[in-house]
Every structure is written in C-alpha cells, then in structure tokens.
A protein has these predicted regions:
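Conserved core of the sugar-phosphate nucleotidyltransferase
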Residues: 104-183
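Phosphate- and divalent-cation-binding pockets in alpha/beta enzyme and binding domains
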Residues: 13, 57-60, 79, 106, ...
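N-terminal nucleotide-binding beta1-loop-alpha1 segment
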Residues: 1-17, 197
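Conserved alpha/beta core of the MobA/IspD/sugar-nucleotide pyrophosphorylase nucleotidyltransferase superfamily
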Residues: 1, 158-225
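A generic "binding-loop/recognition-motif" signal
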Residues: 10, 19, 54, 204-207
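Conserved beta-strand segments of alpha/beta enzyme cores
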Residues: 22, 66-68, 148, 197-199
Length: 225
C-alpha cells in the first residue's frame, strides 16, 4: 500500500513551540517520524512525503524513517496543490494523510481496507462527537448519508462526524482537483461528493489527534507517553 503524506505547509498555529509541524517533537520524536512509524506498523510499505516549507529538514526526517519525498514548490498554496504535485506518482489506490494528524495504526488499517468500486475516495470519519481531543472550533465537519459524504467543511451547522485526516484515494481525486485554481483538498472531496463518489468509513474505535496548537500537542504527548 502506498501512502502520501502532505507535509508542505507552514503550520503557523504551532510556531510558538516548533518551526514546522512535521518537525514538532512529540515526546522527543518528530511528529512526521511517529506518523511514518505508525504507517509501517499498519503495513504501509511505500510512503511518499510531499515537502515544501523547510523542505530539506522535513525530507531528512522522512528519509531517516524510510520514506521517499517529493518537493512541492508551491507549498504556500492550499493543500490540494500538494495533492496535485503527487499526481504523477499516485498509484491506483493510496492512503492520503496530513502531517499534523497523528493516528494509531488501526486508523490506517481500517481506511486502507475500505476501498470500494463505487467510490473515488473513502474518508475515515469519527462519530464520537464531543471527544476531548477534538477542537470543535477547528475540526473539519462531515455530514454523511448512506455511507457517503453529503457535505464537508469547517463551518457546517449540521453534521454527524469529524474528518480524521486520513483518506483512501484514487486518481479520481486528482482529476477533480486539476481544473481548479489553487484548490484545497476539500474542494476535490466536494466535487466527488457531488457525484456520489465520496464514501466514508467509521474509525471511531481507534484514536487520532490533529496536532494544530500547543493544547493538542500536550494531549498527544500524554497519549504516546
């Protein structure tokens, strides 16, 4: 299984404690290294890290953990641009994840096993509303219907799940992003959802956290010990 890890952005909300989210130390180990360790534990053998801001340093961590890298020179653009940078290397199916989301191997295994011929992507969702690790003011909200994404975004008023930041994707996603100008990943997800090609899989039995600010970093460090 291939995994594409988006690690190009600047991550301004953690700048007070770290110069770069992927390089942030979580209990003494770089966040990106922990993500790659958990991917390996889940059986992922072909990780590809998309670098950008502080790319040489991020690439050094990725290479030390056994991953390949690809630099996105437009790293200051929305994250859909990093997905498009990976398009020439994208396999028929791949995990797609964010370098600021730390997930247990069970999350990756569950999403990797959720492929279906009637979907161009599958998003891992968490239905544990009110979980203390979730930042309700910032988490991406998902409204689902019959196992598919009906709506997705940070400002939804009606929703029944959180986006855990881990997808199983196919080239349908990059095809949806390609015509757009400086797209975000969610733009591609919405395009597939409009065609009923965006499915979901429940990962609520497994833990994950979006390490987006000092509070979340403290929670993550307590989790990994």
């Amino acid at each position: 299984m291939q995994a594409i890890i988006l690690a190009a952005g600047m991550g301004t909300r953690l700048r007070s404690v770290s110069p770069s989210k992927p390089l942030t130390l979580v209990a003494g180990r770089a966040l990106l290294h922990r993500i790659l360790d958990n991917l390996r534990a889940a059986g992922v053998t072909r990780p590809l890290v998309i670098t950008g801001y502080r790319g040489d340093e991020v690439a050094a961590v990725a290479h030390a953990a056994g991953a390949e890298t690809l630099h996105n020179p437009r790293w200051d653009q929305p994250n859909g641009v990093s997905v498009l940078a990976a398009a020439p290397r994208l396999e028929a199916q791949a995990l797609l994840l964010m370098a600021d989301h730390l997930a247990s191997p069970g999350v990756y295994r569950t999403v990797a096993a959720a492929g279906r011929p009637d979907a161009g992507l599958v998003l891992g969702i968490d239905r544990r509303m009110g979980h203390p690790w979730a930042d309700e003011a910032d988490v991406t909200r998902v409204s689902t219907r019959a196992g598919r994404i009906a709506a997705i975004g940070k400002t939804l008023n009606t929703y029944d799940a959180h986006d855990c930041g881990v997808f199983l994707v196919t080239p349908e996603l990059t095809a949806a992003l390609a015509p757009l100008t400086a797209p975000g990943l969610s733009d591609g997800v919405r395009a597939l959802a409009a065609r009923r090609r965006a499915a979901v899989v429940d990962i609520s039995a497994h833990d994950w956290i979006d390490i987006d600010d000092p509070r979340a970093l403290a929670l993550a460090e307590a989790w990994v010990g």
